[in-house]
Amino acid sequence: TLLCREDIEIKGKRIAIVGCGRVGRPLSMMFVQFGGVPTLCNSSTNKFRPDTMEKIVGECDILVTCTGIYDIVNVDWIKDETVVIDVGVQRINDKLTGEINREKLNERNIIATPSPGGVGPMTVAMLMNNLTLAWYKQQNIEIMNSNHCDHFRWATDERDELLEE
């Protein structure tokens, strides 16, 4: 839904996922369901070597980093207008940061989630959404089969209106 909020289409997009653990592997399956073409870069494959990763990252439309390693992807590898989803959060010099060098990233024409503060709050929101859907299902309450993007847009538009008041 982070991508839905920004009207970013997944279908047909080349997606590089750096890290194939508890976050990367399920994300790759989700992207396939939405018509994306993911490539996983994992430490157990040759796709994790810097020269190979540079090529994969340089060709992707959407980049997801979820390794827990700061500066795992050189910002110079990322082409302009790439969408970057920085999942990882770590502490460096008593400051929380993501995996991508934010200073270098901000100098480029790249769309990126904040980190920290981007994926984490969205994860909590989706957990609450799934909990609500599970409760409805348990109570045998039929709900509209709506597009997740439309539902999310409605919820965030309502929130934004409340914040403006």
Model-identified regions with their sequence ranges:
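Glycine-rich phosphate/diphosphate-binding loop of Rossmann-like nucleotide-binding domains
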Residues: 1-77, 83, 97, 102-103
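A charged, well-structured terminal subsegment
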Residues: 3-7, 133, 138-148
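Alpha-helix boundary/interfacial micro-motifs
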Residues: 29-30, 78, 85, 98, ...
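Intrinsic-disorder/low-complexity regions
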Residues: 41, 100, 108, 156-159
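Short, surface-exposed, polar/charged, turn-prone segments marking secondary-structure boundaries
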Residues: 44-46, 67-68, 91-93, 112-113, ...
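Rossmann-fold NAD(P)-binding glycine/threonine-rich loop
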Residues: 85-141
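Eukaryotic N-terminal low-complexity, Ser/Thr- and Lys/Arg-rich leader segments
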Residues: 142-165
